């Protein structure tokens, strides 16, 4: 058997019908790809040189990685893991255990960790302490009610959508560029210091009042629809390309300073006037479900898709 291959360094056995994998004692093994099999049990004890593990799309129920202290990358998405403990693994940089059945995940004190994806599990809590270098976190589609990112100063990518979060405070995460926090229970979203945003989706939440995105000069995509927001501040956001603010409580919407915008969905609000005459790149406009009395367009402006309840409201500047 493979246990006698004591000098084995690389093992690629992906896309087979393997049901169990015993690599115990292979202390020179550095690379394993056993993805797309039927593996239920995997023994990696004594694999002290292992650096990269790809075990995606199997049926693995438990994975003990504690003896693999040199691991740098672990991919084990789409398995049947219920728990995963990689705490204190100081060389681990990348971890993807998404699409499992995890109820516990211990990733604390992985001092070199850059990327974690633990989305689509059953996590009710997530300890992010000791991950000061983390740049990307995917914890979407879990059972999280709180998320403390205060000790992640380098984080630029966060996907925490489809949880039960009521508050998200990103005050200390000033490098955030991509934020997807839709489909939660958010009433509070603190992003005042997040001036590097390029994409934000905070739709399907309980947000009220004003969403102030002013001075986000690199912001290109916004989705704040299906909320209770009443005001949107886009001052100096000149690079916005798509804006979705449908089904909110906006009675006014100023997009005159967004010349790069190609798509606007503001349907189902309480807008009475809308001026898109400065949005000469606009290709798609959904503004139905508003009591519009005036929609301002520019002379000769060409919008390929325009949906409006009252075409008589259209006028030209």
PLM ranges: what are they?
Residues 13, 24, 35, 45, ...:
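Ser/Thr/Pro-rich low-complexity tandem-repeat tracts
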Residues 1-21, 26:
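LRR N-terminal entry segment and analogous cap-like coil->beta motifs
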Residues 5-8, 26-29, 47-50, 68-71, ...:
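Leucine-rich repeat
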Residues 11-13, 30-34, 51-55, 72-76, ...:
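Conserved hydrophobic beta-strand positions in leucine-rich repeat
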Residues 277-317:
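Leucine-rich solenoid repeat scaffolds
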Residues 21-23, 42, 63, 84, ...:
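Canonical leucine-rich repeat
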């Amino acid at each position: 058997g493979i246990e006698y291959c004591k000098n084995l360094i690389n093992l690629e056995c992906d896309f087979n019908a393997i049901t169990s994998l015993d690599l115990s004692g292979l202390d020179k093994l550095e690379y394993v790809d056993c993805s797309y099999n039927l593996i239920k049990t995997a023994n990696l004890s004594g694999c002290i040189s292992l650096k990269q593990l790809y075990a995606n799309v199997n049926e693995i129920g438990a994975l003990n990685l504690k003896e693999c202290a040199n691991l740098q990358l672990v991919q084990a998405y789409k398995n049947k893991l219920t728990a995963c403990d990689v705490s204190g693994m100081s060389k681990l940089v990348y971890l993807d255990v998404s699409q499992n059945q995890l109820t516990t995940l211990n990733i604390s004190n992985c001092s070199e960790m850059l990327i974690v994806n633990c989305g689509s599990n059953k996590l009710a809590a997530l300890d992010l302490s000791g991950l000061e270098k983390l740049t990307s976190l995917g914890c979407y589609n879990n059972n999280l009610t709180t998320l403390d990112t205060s000790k992640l100063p380098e984080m630029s990518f966060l996907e925490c959508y489809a949880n039960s979060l009521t508050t998200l405070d990103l005050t200390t995460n000033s490098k955030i560029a991509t934020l997807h926090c839709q489909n939660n229970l958010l009433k509070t979203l603190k992003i005042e210091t997040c001036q590097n945003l390029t994409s934000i989706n905070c739709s399907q939440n309980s947000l009220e009042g004003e969403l102030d995105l002013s001075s986000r000069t690199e912001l290109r995509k916004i989705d704040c629809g299906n909320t209770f927001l009443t005001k949107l501040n886009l001052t100096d956001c000149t690079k916005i390309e798509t804006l979705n603010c449908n089904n909110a409580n906006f009675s006014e919407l100023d997009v005159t300073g967004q010349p790069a915008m190609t798509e606007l969905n503001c349907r189902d609000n309480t807008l009475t006037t809308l001026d898109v005459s400065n949005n000469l790149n606009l290709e798609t406009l959904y503004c139905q479900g508003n009591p519009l009395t005036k929609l301002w367009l520019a002379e000769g402006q060409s919008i390929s898709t325009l949906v409006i309840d009252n075409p008589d409201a259209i006028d030209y500047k």
